[in-house]
UniProtKB/Swiss-Prot annotation:
GO MF entries: DNA binding; excinuclease ABC activity
Species: Corynebacterium glutamicum (strain R)
Record carries keyword Phosphoprotein: no
Protein's gene: uvrC
Domain UVR: 208-243
One Gene Ontology CC term in the entry: cytoplasm
Keyword Metal-binding: no
Quaternary structure, from the entry: Interacts with UvrB in an incision complex.
Function noted in UniProt: The UvrABC repair system catalyzes the recognition and processing of DNA lesions. UvrC both incises the 5' and 3' sides of the lesion. The N-terminal half is responsible for the 3' incision and the C-terminal half is responsible for the 5' incision.
Designated name of the protein: UvrABC system protein C
UniProtKB keywords: Cytoplasm, DNA damage, DNA excision, DNA repair, Excision nuclease, SOS response
Compartments in which it is found: Cytoplasm
Family per similarity comment: Belongs to the UvrC family.
SMART domains xrefs: GIYc (SM00465), HhH1 (SM00278)
Amino acid sequence: MADPTTYRPAPGTIPTEPGVYKFRDENRRVIYVGKAKNLRSRLSNYFQDVTQLHPRTRQMVFAASSVEWTVVSSEVEALQLEYTWIKRFDPRFNVKYRDDKTYPMLAVSTGERFPRAFFFRGPRRKGVRYFGPYSHAWAVRETLDLLTRVFPMRTCSKGVFNRHESLGRPCLLGYIDKCAAPCVGRVSEEEHREIVDGFTSFMAGHTDKVTRKLNADMMAAAEELDFERAARLRDDLEAIDKVMEKQAVVLGDGTDADIIAFATDQLEAAVQVFNIRGGRIRGQRGWVVDKPGDYAGLLVDATTQPEGDAPETDPALPFLMQDFLVQFYGDAVERAETEAKEDAAVIERRGVDKHSFEEAAPVTRASVVPREILVQVAPNEAEQTLKVLEELRGAGVDARVPQRGDKRALMETVERNAKELLKQHKLKRVGDLTARSAALQELQEALDMEQAPLRIECTDISHIQGTDVVASLVVFEDGLPRKSDYRRYRVKEAAGDGHSNDVASIAEITRRRFLRHNQDKLAVPEAEEFDGSTFSDEKVEEMSTDARRFAYPPQIFIVDGGAPQVAAAQEVFDELGIVDVVLIGLAKRLEEIWLPGDPDPVILPRNSQALFLLQQIRDEAHRFAITYHRQQRSKRMRVSELDSIKGLGQSRRTELVKHFGSVAKLKEASVEDISQVKGFGPKLAEAVYEGLHASK
């Protein structure tokens, strides 16, 4: 790995114009591509104090051995060249939104002589047109089942097709009119292609055109007294209605739009895209990617990273949005143009009538880049990004943040899906046995432990400006949460008068937890104490079950914070003689691991299973603490001054407030006024008056 100072450009050699730059490693491979309004200003950030760089950026500059740049005439050109180079070089430190191969799709093999429709999951192939993605496999199969009643195109494999072609009789679908049976010549190649065109046109969103044609044909058949055909067309319309019912209208104005939202944490970002066509959700997909730290303005400001509760506050979000818009729609247009070329080749090779083929609503730039793009936040360099999108579409694009109404509500739905995607991704990383074993093994090695940790505990403090100060203690055993051992605390000594000392709070909770450990250890009898007469089986079970949870210390005890919190907890360990527990602090912002007495933190790799496990434990402690804090705050806010008055039950308190309107107005009342309330005599009225005015 090269020291960045060894390849730093000489002063004054970097131009100040807009441009795109490449970092290369010692093997001349491009490892990172970036753009800049001012190349000199941007590149100089990489060669300052490397300790101040974001961890991922720091890793990149040490992996590189040279840097190159290309000057361009405008920021829009820089954005386009950056996208081109990322596609060409596939740099490992750039964010790349690759196709997720797990989403089910509905595919049509347009390159075959008799195209077929089929369920598909995997990398895209040439000569196939895709619709979706769908959230569930059953949705693909159900859609296909309903639409083949209207568009009886081939759905069988090549082997099944060839077998029935040689037998001279169709399969079951041919007999029940869910396939036009081209295998036995019931329809010609051109007639089958027209059926396929209708199917793809419907799937591309041209539903009104299809339903109008079917309705007109049905009416014409009825006028000609061809009631059998009219009934069949009526059934086709009902089948289409069923498909449409399953795609509920979410935007009543029939909008074509894409809705895009992110959810982020310190290390990763999840993005969700909902495709709305004709006001209905036609597709949904998502990605989870590593979040780089070298965006302009964030290169050295890594401490501003969010905790994950409010992604809209993440300063990296506009940059993520810009990268995604350019990559996502650039790739979509490239695929559309490739499919158009393949379709043209089919026309030429098969001799299909071009006019009928174009009726199938071919994929165009305008169909993959919609007129309206609703985004969670405005992208970085919004004007330049919009110009790139308009060039990709070949027409105007309206990219904006919805503020109210149905579109805002739909954006909130997409945001929730993005958060759920990120949550499920993080759980998946630590949920399976292999990943958990690897995480525990990595922790053992990183912390120089003799054995992999079986039990890990973590504490977190929660408060608002020193009020309702509480703490949580969560327990993970074998990498999984053990919720029966969770504990929550009200901080006593370190809280009060509107201020809270987080360091003192950590010390208090650590002391209380390990004092309990020492007490429980004494409460569990040693093996030699059991002689069969001193304790009954029931007594032994009662004693050990109640005490065993905290009689044995964790192998790792995590405090939420950095060096000060770790030092405070270590003082408690020294005071109580705790020597068999590894104490660490996990700093939220940079995900650094602090050990007692060490001047520098331990940095785990971003893709480390151990780091994901520690994050999950810390986040669980935070969730448990903040939930308890909210409960305490709500409880305090519900407490009334009337609660402290003896002899005043709930019904009488309610009657007083109902009579006077509020406690404030009740305070203004005299003893005589209070005694006028039903159920209040002079003695009780006097007690209420004294109780309210004594509390001042």
